[in-house]
Curated annotation (Swiss-Prot):
Name of the protein in its database record: Dihydroorotate dehydrogenase B (NAD(+)), catalytic subunit
Cofactor note: Binds 1 FMN per subunit.
Annotated FMN binding sites: S19, K43, A44, N97, N125, K163, I189, G215, G241, G242, G263, T264
Pathways per UniProt: Pyrimidine metabolism; UMP biosynthesis via de novo pathway; orotate from (S)-dihydroorotate (NAD(+) route): step 1/1
Annotated organism of origin: Bacillus velezensis (strain DSM 23117 / BGSC 10A6 / LMG 26770 / FZB42)
Physiological role: Catalyzes the conversion of dihydroorotate to orotate with NAD(+) as electron acceptor.
GO MF assignments: dihydroorotate dehydrogenase (NAD+) activity
Entry similarity comment: Belongs to the dihydroorotate dehydrogenase family. Type 1 subfamily.
Compartments it resides in: Cytoplasm
Alphabetized UniProt keyword annotations: Cytoplasm, Flavoprotein, FMN, NAD, Oxidoreductase, Pyrimidine biosynthesis
Binding, substrate: K43, N67, A68, I69, G70, L71, N125, N190, T191
Cofactor(s) required, per the database record: FMN
InterPro entries attached to this UniProt entry: Aldolase_TIM, DHO_dehydrogenase, DHOD_1B, Dihydroorotate_DH_1, Dihydroorotate_DH_1_2, Dihydroorotate_DH_cat, Dihydroorotate_DH_CS, Dihydroorotate_DH_I
Quaternary context: Heterotetramer of 2 PyrK and 2 PyrD type B subunits.
Length: 311
């Protein structure tokens, strides 16, 4: 009922913790068996270790949070020698998030990390809003996005998914350029750029001034973008942005996503992913669906039937 097959990814269910909200899984392994997850999107990995942005770099908002972590990570060598081998104990495919400042940085990380035995796909991070070079610079220009995608595809041993930024005028144009460059799938959306001010000082709360807005506040934006992009491309989408419940996950599937990543909600409730997995079959049946594949893109597909007419 819950199985989903995507390029490189045979998922037992469509629920995946999102990169940047799950580390490398060690904190959450103390709460539940990570083998129950459809997959795991690990923390963004760069060639060299990064300390990230100065603090403060997290701020709560009324319906989510702002972060300006700045791709803090232990670097490629550490991830290959320690984090990925530790994750081999779990029966779930790993999606490695690859980041960098230049095309060669991405290629270096992609070539090596894609050869790890438990890495089944790459997530190309071209949409981080909190770094000064690389990151979102690639994700806001269709030509640059396509060139980077093509370069990484040439060296990767596994399928490549590209993470899209919502901070663009036309996300569909970016998506189509990335598809044409050979991407195997898309993940979307990354965070929206936002800011909070300290009323006492009149200054931005975050040391970076701006940060990425995530959580329930961005879900309507994410749903709209998945809905639009899924009709314009022929590669699968892993949807994300404000997912907290099985009902939220179903909404993304109906919009056109083939799987769903859960991000900020992990900070609020460490059990959120297994809870959604447990509740999803009931929610699917409640709305007349017998499988995940049956409801993907249902909101826009022309051959629509009322739920009570389906077998």
């Amino acid at each position: 009922m819950l199985e989903v097959n995507l390029p490189g990814l045979q998922l037992k269910n469509p629920i995946i913790p999102a990169s940047g909200c799950f580390g490398f899984g060690k904190e959450y392994a103390g709460f539940y068996d990570l083998s129950c997850l459809g997959g795991i999107m690990i923390k963004a990995t760069t060639n060299e270790a990064r300390f990230g942005n100065p603090t403060p770099r997290v701020a709560e908002t009324s319906a989510g949070m702002l972060n300006a972590i700045g791709l803090q990570n232990p670097g490629l060598e550490h991830v290959l020698n320690h984090e990925l081998p530790w994750l081999e104990q779990f029966d779930t495919p790993i999606i490695a998030n690859v980041a960098g400042s230049q095309v060669d940085d991405y290629k270096e990380v992609a070539e090596h990390i894609s050869q790890a035995p438990n890495v089944h796909a790459l997530e190309l991070n071209i949409s981080c809003p909190n770094v000064k070079t690389g990151g979102i610079a690639f994700g806001t220009d269709p030509v640059m996005a396509a060139e980077l995608t093509k370069a990484v595809k040439e060296v990767s041993a596994v399928p490549v998914y590209v993470k899209l930024s919502p901070n663009v005028a036309n996300i569909t144009e970016i998506a189509k350029a990335i598809e044409a460059a050979g991407a195997d799938g898309l993940t979307m959306i990354n965070t929206l750029i936002g800011m909070r001010l300290d009323l006492k000082t009149g200054r931005p709360i975050l040391a970076n001034k701006t940060g990425g807005l995530s959580g329930p506040a961005i879900k309507p934006v994410a749903i709209r973008m998945v809905y639009e992009v899924s009709q314009a491309v022929h590669i699968p989408i892993i949807g994300m942005g404000g997912v907290q419940t099985a009902e939220d996950a179903l909404e993304f599937l109906l919009a056109g996503a083939s799987a769903v990543a859960v991000g900020t909600a992990n900070f609020v409730n460490p059990f959120v992913c297994p809870e959604i997995i447990e509740q999803l079959p009931r929610v699917l049946r409640q709305y007349g669906f017998q499988s995940v594949s049956e409801c993907i893109g249902r909101s826009w597909k022309h051959e629509k039937q009322p739920a009570h007419h389906r077998a």
